[in-house]
Amino acid sequence: SLQIKNLLLYNGLMKNIIFIFGTRPEIIKLAPVILELKKYPEDYNVIICNTEQQKELSNQTLAYFGLKADINLDCMRENQSLSSVQARILTSLDKVFCEREIDATIVQGDTMTVLCGALTSFYHKIPVYHVEAGLRSYDIYEPFPEEVMRQMTSRVAALHFAPTGVNKDALLKEGIDTDKIHVVGNT
């Protein structure tokens, strides 16, 4: 997480950074980064946005780390199709991006929230920083729909924080510039 903080400073990023997540695993991976950036309020205004893809689990996990979402989107409904979930998250995030000044978006992993956060940020011409980038199965149906979500997120990400050299190689193979990929391990 300290390496990610230093890369953000190196890239001239200051102030309004939105972390978008909705699941317990995303929070577990992003909490160390959030907590590190919160130590530097003169450099970063950390905005925590929870789509509540896993409402109870995500809120419990935030509390475990002593964190609270600044924005809760409550995007899930019973028996939603993937298209309905995506439409609800995209629409909700678009409203957030229209109402707030955001300098960068950080997402983690390969969920619907990650893809929607990346797309919304891209539509608003705000850089996307993808944590756990470069994981690949090369089978769009395994895992489904996550493989497509992580590949699409990579297409719009400005920086890719890959866990391993294997993940970096996967991104290089897809034409991502080497200077946009940073092997940081797992958070």
Give the residues covered by each predicted segment.
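N-terminal subdomain of nucleotide-sugar transferases
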Residues: L9-E52
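Conserved nucleotide-sugar phosphate-binding/catalytic loop shared by glycosyltransferases and other
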Residues: Y44-V85, S92
